[in-house]
Amino acid sequence: MSAGVAVESTALPSAPGLNVYETVAAAIGNTALVRLNAVTEGIEAAVYAKLEFLNPGGSVKDRAARSMIEAAESSGELAPGGTVVEGTSGNTGIGLAMVAASRGYRTIVVVPDKTSAEKVAFLRAHGAEVRVTEGARPTDHPDHVRNIARRIADETPGGWLAGQYDNPANIGAHYASTGPELWQQTGGRITHFVAGIGTGGTISGTGRYLKEVSDGFVTVVGADPLNSTYNGGDGRAYYIESIGHFLHPDSPEDIWPECYDRSVVDSILTVTDREAITTVRALARREGLLVGGSGGAAVAAALRLARTLPADATVVVLIPDSGRAYLSKYFDDDWVARLGFDDRTGDVAVTDLLGDTLDPLTVPSDATVAEALEVLGDRPELPVVLRRTPSSLVVAEIVGSVTRNDLIAANPTSVVTEHLSVPLSVVGAFESLGAAVKRIGADTRTVVVAESGIVSGLLSAGQLTDRSSGERSGR
């Protein structure tokens, strides 16, 4: 270009279909809709997956992040040079950090300790300051994820709390974009919309739009972890991140997000951790789609629903994020085996040593030392778990262990959580004896046996090593 020639704009031409954007935030949305073909064998209805991991930040939460930041800028709550703060399981924080970085804001994100290592790494890569805190805390605890985030926002000059759970801009993002996209992509033929329920923003905003535009014809179905209180579960922990509603037993009440509009959701299908994990692995190996656990839960629910529908039905299931954020979890054979989410092989397995044992003994986290010693009896140690009414015990709710020797010297009226030792080793119920012995290594303490993430029994380390030695010698 010759000198002295005026240039009106250096921006490239932008038009529908060109996918040219001047900012990363502008590239959010308009994600692909892909038909599922292999995992739908025997199903007459069409099942399509909305691939939200194709957003720039890798998840559906990019939509809410952009919407919330833009709303805060418009209202003046977030000013130039400000700090974006949020408590999140990871994806919303990543979206916020991405948009914030592109606009010159600082970001501080508080995440629970069950958040995958990959998500924490993504956050830090975007320049976010990450605070990790224990996830299994009651809602009124000062160090609960959302309470820490609120405190940081209040104490930080220029701090703004995104507050995704109760922020109407969360719902608005999906009413304005996700819903219209699905209606346009399906040519108005969508009959059923399936999505997980986390903050409620995605299913409420998208579902509300689809119901309005279809004059109530579209059915909205929520996919929810079995233990989640959204479907009437007792709130126990589960292993699928980013959906459902966990309730700590010491929380004074079960407060649901304001973004979850229950009137939009026609029904909820519950999904177990095992079903979700099995589904994500099947999607990767049969469909070529690497999706996260919440997407696996949603697809599992969608397939179950689709099997009941006629050939003229069109089911759309929303995939929130990619499996790349969970390679150390759902796609890691060792992680899957340790928690008993795998299938048994022909080898003698750990579960064969349990026999017809009674429910495994545990010490509730609110027990006194005297009460714990009574439960222990002559046992050397036992796991300490969150206090719940009698039911299946999720491995994730083991908060540590106590030893008889430590408690004998302690104040009998003190609480056992003041005397915790590290958690006991966990082995999968379907692991071979050799694999289990290798896993515990030199640990001589009691071993927790897990099946589908649930404690199925306790064994002494000696039981494992002796039987394994016997198997190797042919006894």
Describe the residue ranges of each PLM region.
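Terminal peptide-recognition signature
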Residues: 100, 123, 182, 288, ...
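Bateman (tandem CBS) regulatory domains
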Residues: 261-264, 346-361, 367, 413-424
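Structural motif
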Residues: 86-87, 110, 133, 196, ...
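Short hydrophobic beta-strand segments in globular cytosolic domains
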Residues: 393, 398-399, 426, 450, ...
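The conserved cystathionine-beta-synthase
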Residues: 361-389, 425-452, 461-475
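Short hydrophobic beta-strand motif reused across regulatory alpha/beta modules
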Residues: 399-403, 407, 456-464
